[in-house]
């Protein structure tokens, strides 16, 4: 009881305060005392419930999670209160309603209980998310306990832009960027990344935004991340731009942007050095994990809200004002939320109203938003029921225009009967020229709104009478739920040409595409060019045919084509822009088709033989463009302009093309080898990656890569061995090494080896020159040496140059050798008895015989004595005429 008494004291205090507030309320609103008392009772009941809730056992109920909204390109984050759904020991499962997994753009973190993601343009619409709790059963299966379903509606990229800017921040003191005025452009900084958002998981997208948030210190809700559309990486309206660290774009590209201010220019833009320098030097790329292609700053025009069309609650009787409604008021779109016993979402039925952008007003008001000069006037007779006119059906008394543009005829607004709820029928009713007075049609129950028909061309020959009801009826009062003057009475104005397309350049065999800029035309009612209907025509108001080499997609407003050699020259086309009212503006421009960009100088020619008949490919421009796109995709190039189609011939389908990314000079052999290995093996068999890129439209049979231009002597992938009768072809170079090793070998081959050879030649030449010089100088004396030996004479030997170690020989010692042998005996003469020799010539001996036998008693011949003194008449040098001593006599050992 003490606890109860302690709890009742604050209860009585609260009761006293409530009674005091009731008294004050009664003093101010004495006419409604019952409401104040009833409000007091409710507050008292709530107070009692809050005091005694701790002592009551809570009944497990399903807690509803509020619905959420997301915007394309913006981060979405919501915390799921799992503690209110699941108790201890239960497992939380989050998935799409009726499915096993979440949508592809959402990520669930079971630890932090946060559901986050970043939707793309393909994720627009309403997504129903189911949060269920399950308990592990005895058999190991999960037994569902409770479940809750909520919805997330994804709006387009330009929807509700200021709300994302004015998002509440976690820090109360944080300065939230102010929204710009309605007509004021928003200055946006955009960073281009070499990434593909479609290949990322939701977690990777959010992590990319978080890394950019930590790098740039920009709040997460202020950043936008969208993929690149139509290869438009850079904005042509940017007034500031800079490069990144990426040299080549590989992926599709992603644009990460945030707001800088309102209508800034180059002088008033804030300091961007924190983006410019890191993007160029690679610091931003290292932080984000993706290469940065560049950045730019541009002013974006705000997107004007589209005028909405609503059903008109009117009666067939013309009155000055619309009275109270007699039909049931349509309820806003409803959604079926499953209970814990049936967690599945029921399929949509015929009782569900069509989705609308804004809630349907509760009061019976009429909102009329028309485009063009359309005046709501009552008709003279009963209104005909809605009729769907088939193609080729002629309605009597009706003006039939010569040209009907589909997609711009307004739907007929109908009145919903009081007891039924139907979907809005999407039918169009032509306006009758003369009101019908047939009595059989006087019981009309579904009056129709005045339809919008295209303006008739003056060439119409129908002359049916037309009744103009402009002043015969009283003016109709129109109520609108929004402020502003209705535009129903304003005349439709013709679109204006703001910026000419002027000229488009194209090359033979190269695919091109041109996105019509949004500022080309402008219409006061329909605004920019992307809201208008564009049509490409020839000079004679003739539409471009399906087989023309130039095609135009009116939905994406993209002009593309693939010219061949017969289209070289200048071609004139006309772009017609038509608004919703049928008025149009025209811009004339020229397409200049040039010859092939590389001509016959391409370093390599790629040739592929495909299965099938070449005639359908040659005659169908769409198939040719598809083939070029597939070839570019097989090489890893997203830009199709890198492929130049040379020829398509017979022999199945023989396609010959060149790659515009290869340099012309010098021969890029390594790059060609790399491209060849990517699509085929050494024998010319297509690789699986190349075949998969062409399938299912084309099937590759064989591939050949032949050098041309600077590489004309090389053949990289042979198609077939040369025939015996043909001349000897150059040897095929089969690359059997890695490209890096081949590059190093080329460096040695073209740089190191020639340098060594030249150095060796110079060294040998130097050695030969030095030898020749030394040989020529040998035997020649210098001037000093020549001066020394210029006089002839006996050399002078000084006294100190003599060897005096041995004493001179004594005079008593004979001058002959001590071991000298005795002299030979004297010769024998012919007078001796036995001659020692026999004359060689007997005739000669016979001549001298009488001389020997003349005097036998004569003495033997005695030789004369030797000379002891010089002969007279010959002078000799006097003694001691030289200043040096004679050398010592020879002394035998």
From Swiss-Prot:
Residues modified as Phosphotyrosine: 890
Amino acid composition bias (Low complexity), ranges on this chain: 409-445
Motif PPXY motif, residue numbers: 887-890
Region of interest (O-glycosylated at one site), ranges: 47-69
Segments of skewed composition (Pro residues): 857-868
Region spans: Required for binding DMD and UTRN: 878-893
Residue positions, PTM Phosphothreonine: 788
Compositional bias of kind Basic and acidic residues: 734-744
InterPro entries assigned to the protein according to its UniProt record, in alphabetical order: Alpha-dystroglycan_domain_2, Alpha_DG1_N2, Cadg, Cadherin-like_sf, DAG1_C, Ig-like_fold, SEA_DG_dom
Span of domain Peptidase S72: 601-710
PTMs per UniProt: Autolytic cleavage produces the alpha and beta subunits. In cutaneous cells, as well as in certain pathological conditions, shedding of beta-dystroglycan can occur releasing a peptide of about 30 kDa.
Cellular component GO terms held in the UniProt record: adherens junction; basement membrane; basolateral plasma membrane; cell surface; cell-cell junction; contractile ring; costamere; cytoskeleton
Side Extracellular, residues: 652-751
Biological process, per Gene Ontology: angiogenesis involved in wound healing; axon regeneration; basement membrane organization; branching involved in salivary gland morphogenesis; calcium-dependent cell-matrix adhesion; cellular response to cholesterol; cellular response to mechanical stimulus; commissural neuron axon guidance
Entry-listed glycosylation sites: 139, 315, 317, 377, 639, 647, 659
Motif (Nuclear localization signal): 774-780
Transmembrane intervals: 752-772
Quaternary structure and partners: Monomer. Heterodimer of alpha- and beta-dystroglycan subunits which are the central components of the dystrophin-glycoprotein complex. This complex then can form a dystrophin-associated glycoprotein complex (DGC) which is composed of three subcomplexes: a cytoplasmic complex comprised of DMD (or UTRN), DTNA and a number of syntrophins, such as SNTB1, SNTB2, SNTG1 and SNTG2, the transmembrane dystroglycan complex, and the sarcoglycan-sarcospan complex. Interacts (via the N-terminal of alphaDAG1) with LARGE1; the interaction enhances laminin binding. Interacts with SGCD.
Record protein name field: Dystroglycan 1
């Amino acid at each position: 009881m003490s606890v109860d008494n302690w709890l009742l004291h604050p209860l009585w205090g609260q009761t006293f305060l409530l009674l005091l507030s009731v008294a004050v309320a009664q003093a101010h609103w004495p006419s409604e005392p019952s409401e104040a008392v009833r409000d007091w009772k409710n507050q008292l009941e709530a107070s009692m419930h809050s005091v005694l809730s701790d002592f009551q056992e809570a009944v497990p109920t399903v807690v509803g999670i509020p619905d959420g909204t997301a915007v394309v390109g913006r981060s979405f984050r919501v915390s799921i209160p799992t503690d209110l759904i699941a108790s201890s020991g239960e497992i939380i499962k989050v998935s799409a309603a009726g499915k096993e997994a979440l949508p592809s753009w959402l990520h669930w973190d079971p630890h932090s209980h946060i559901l986050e993601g970043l939707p793309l343009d393909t994720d627009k619409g309403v997504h129903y998310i189911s949060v269920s709790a399950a308990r592990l059963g005895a058999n190991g299966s999960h037994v569902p306990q409770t479940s809750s379903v909520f919805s997330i509606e994804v709006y387009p990229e330009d929807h509700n832009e200021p709300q994302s800017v004015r998002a509440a921040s976690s820090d109360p003191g944080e300065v939230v960027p102010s929204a710009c005025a309605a007509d004021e452009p928003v200055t946006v900084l955009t960073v281009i990344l070499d990434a593909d958002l479609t290949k990322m998981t939701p977690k990777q997208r959010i992590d990319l935004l978080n890394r950019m948030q930590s790098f740039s210190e920009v709040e997460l809700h202020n950043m936008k991340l969208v993929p690149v559309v139509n290869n438009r990486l850079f904005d042509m309206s940017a007034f500031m731009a800079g490069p990144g660290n990426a040299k080549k774009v590989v992926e599709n590209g992603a644009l990460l942007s945030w707001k800088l201010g309102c209508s800034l220019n180059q002088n008033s833009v804030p300091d961007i050095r924190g983006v410019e320098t890191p993007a160029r030097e690679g610091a931003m790329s290292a932080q984000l994990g993706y290469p940065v292609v560049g950045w730019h700053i541009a002013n974006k025009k705000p997107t004007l809200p589209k005028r909405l069309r609503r059903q008109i609650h009117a009666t067939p009787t013309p009155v000055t004002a619309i009275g109270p409604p007699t039909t049931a008021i349509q309820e806003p779109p409803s959604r079926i939320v499953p209970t814990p016993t049936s967690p599945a979402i029921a399929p949509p039925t015929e009782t569900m109203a069509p989705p609308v952008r804004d809630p349907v007003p509760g009061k019976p008001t009429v909102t009329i938003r028309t485009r063009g000069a359309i005046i709501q006037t009552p008709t003279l007779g009963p209104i005909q029921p809605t009729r769907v006119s088939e193609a080729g059906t002629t309605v009597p008394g009706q003006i039939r225009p010569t040209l009907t543009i589909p997609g711009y005829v307004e739907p007929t607004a109908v009145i919903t009967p009081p007891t039924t709820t139907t979907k809005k029928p999407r039918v169009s009713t032509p306006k009758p020229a003369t009101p019908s007075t047939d009595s059989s049609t006087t019981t009309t129950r579904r009056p129709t709104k005045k339809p919008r028909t295209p303006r008739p061309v003056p060439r119409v020959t129908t002359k049916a009478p037309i009744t103009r009801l402009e002043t015969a009826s009283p003016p109709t009062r129109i109520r609108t739920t929004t402020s502003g003057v209705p535009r129903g009475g304003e005349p439709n104005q013709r679109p204006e040409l703001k910026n000419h397309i002027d000229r488009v350049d194209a090359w033979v065999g190269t695919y091109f595409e041109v996105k019509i800029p949004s500022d080309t035309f402008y219409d006061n009612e329909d605004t920019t060019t992307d809201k208008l209907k564009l049509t490409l025509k020839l000079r004679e108001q003739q539409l471009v045919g399906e087989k023309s080499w130039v095609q135009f997609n009116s939905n994406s407003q993209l002009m593309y084509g693939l010219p061949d050699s017969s289209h070289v020259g200048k071609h004139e086309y006309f772009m017609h822009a038509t608004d919703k009212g049928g008025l149009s503006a025209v811009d004339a421009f020229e397409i200049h088709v040039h010859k092939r960009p590389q001509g016959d100088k391409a370093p390599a020619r790629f040739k592929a033989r495909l299965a099938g008949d070449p005639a359908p490919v040659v005659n169908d421009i769409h198939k040719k463009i598809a083939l070029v796109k597939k070839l570019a995709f097989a090489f890893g190039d997203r830009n199709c302009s890198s492929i130049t189609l040379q020829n398509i011939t017979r022999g199945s389908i023989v396609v010959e093309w060149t790659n515009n990314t290869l340099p012309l000079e010098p021969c890029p052999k390594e790059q060609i080898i790399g491209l060849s290995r990517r699509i085929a093996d050494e024998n010319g068999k297509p690789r699986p990656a190349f075949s998969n890129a062409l399938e299912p439209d084309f099937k590759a049979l064989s591939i050949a890569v032949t050098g041309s231009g600077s590489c004309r002597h090389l053949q990289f992938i042979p198609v077939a061995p040369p025939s015996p009768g043909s001349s000897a072809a150059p040897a095929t170079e089969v690359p059997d090494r890695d490209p890096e090793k081949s590059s190093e070998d080329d460096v040695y081959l073209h740089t190191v080896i020639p340098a060594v050879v030249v150095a060796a030649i110079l060294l040998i030449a130097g050695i030969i020159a030095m030898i020749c010089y030394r040989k020529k100088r040998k035997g020649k004396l210098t001037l000093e040496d020549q001066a020394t030996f210029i006089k002839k004479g006996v050399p002078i030997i000084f006294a100190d140059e003599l060897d005096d170690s041995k004493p001179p020989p004594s005079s008593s010692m004979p001058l002959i050798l001590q071991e000298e042998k005795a002299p030979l005996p004297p010769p024998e003469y012919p007078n001796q008895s036995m001659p020692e020799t026999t004359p060689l010539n007997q005739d000669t001996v016979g001549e001298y015989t009488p001389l020997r036998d003349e005097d036998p008693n004569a003495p033997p011949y005695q030789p004369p004595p030797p000379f002891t003194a010089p002969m007279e008449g010959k002078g000799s040098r006097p003694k001691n005429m030289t200043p040096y001593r004679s050398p010592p006599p020879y002394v035998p050992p």
